[in-house]
Amino acid sequence: LNFVGCATLWEGAKGFAGVSTRALEDNRKTAITKTFNYDYFACYTKTMDVLKSMQAYIYTQSIKKHMIAIYVSEEDTTPVGLFFKEIDATNTQVEVSSPSTYAKEFISGNVFPVLDKKITLEELEAQIHAKKETGNK
């Protein structure tokens, strides 16, 4: 059997379906990066909790591949990738990557303060709710 080019075909099929992560991986060199005082699993699950609170649309997640791929929301299909690197048993680096500067700043600007314990998940949800009430995005 000859499997040359399968990865390219698979990536093309994912791109056609609208769920490619290649652009997110390609943009990692310009990612917004920060290290947090959590083990990998805790950091990953807390990030998932924040993304769900933000009502981000999660289209791919893989704890094994250390990544989460989202759209900013169901209405805003700008792709954003969150990549996790286990530094040691108690520290994990998070990279927020996107072709859009606004999208990566928006997502990191909401995820990082919760991971930093500067605001609680409940406070973030209240801020998001308040913005929706006033019509601000």
Where are these regions (language model features)?
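C-terminal motif of bacterial Sec signal peptides marking the signal peptidase cleavage site
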Residues: 2-5
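Ser/Thr-rich, low-complexity intrinsically disordered terminal regions
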Residues: 7-137
